[in-house]
């Protein structure tokens, strides 16, 4: 069977640090909300000035890669075009009211950054008027570079209604058949009716960012352990509602690898999601600047590559976790395929690309390529392009524990 001979890296204890105190005048975005300034056009994050009071559904934030693709900011991405997915993020002066330990958008960052200036998955997120954004993409017609659009919700009292408003504005000008729409949901504020409404308005895929792979880890990084409102059971409740409403192959689950779970624990969630008719979208833990886990190490590459490979086998190759073998620490020691079969999957390289909602090409290649969202370009975790021969050679060394 397909075994690996590396000596696995031990998982560190991943304990969030305590947050800094938030000044009274910074709570709930008060400094920004008191500004008597009307937002004007695109806002580029700048921590050296006070942000204007921008608010969804009139404004959204977009990833740096999307802003580069649209020509709103200069630059180009290392070894790839910018992105094939237009990622939108709801925005409010109050920001996200959750306090997830690994997230750059967390509530505790009121102490040091206005919401519109906070980094998220390693990059800045410029703010753009929704009307301008929709008209720009609509004007591109069939030539648009985007194969998918995704609305990312945050924890805010208005998030559900504003997500519907942004979705209506988009589908009113851009047919979902031309640019399919995904929703990255916030289960904490949602009901089953909210899920159904998004489907009825034209969303194709519904995803849940569980992120933490065990109930205890979820509680420590996303729940009561950090004064955050999220609950493990609620996330699964909304995921199962989405399965019923959107159907099989139209649901997804975000998972972060390397926050203290074992490889087996992570892959058990992957198998559960697959059995429900969904796919898992994987992120390699990276210490986000300003987060409560920014002092902790990134996921060791041998661990990450094993989980990437095993997840691909479960999601797309029909391999079940009960065919795999694990050591006493829960690390994958056998992937449940012959050596020749496993070598062929590794050689193809697709297992090591960014995972997410599919694009126009094939089901196992994500439109949401999130360039360098979980690693620097010098040490790529999720390849936003097809790995070249030299990349695949490095991946093999990483799987063998012989390369960082």
Language-model segments: which ranges?
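Auxiliary Fe-S-binding modules of radical SAM enzymes
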Residues: 1-19, 27-84, 245, 267-404
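N-terminal pre-triad scaffold of radical SAM enzymes
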Residues: 59-109, 148-151
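Conserved mixed alpha/beta catalytic, RNA-binding, or beta-rich assembly cores of soluble enzyme
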Residues: 97, 111, 145-149, 250-252, ...
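Core AdoMet radical
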Residues: 107-136, 140-162, 177-194, 201-236, ...
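Conserved glycine-rich "GG(E/T)P / GGGxP" loop and the immediately following alpha-helix
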Residues: 147-173, 258-265
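Alpha-helix-loop-beta-strand connector modules within alpha/beta enzyme cores
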Residues: 164-178, 230-248, 301-317
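Conserved strand-turn element in the central/C-terminal portion of the radical SAM core barrel
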Residues: 184-188, 224-225, 238-264, 285, ...
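Catalytic cores of alpha/beta
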Residues: 193-198, 260-274
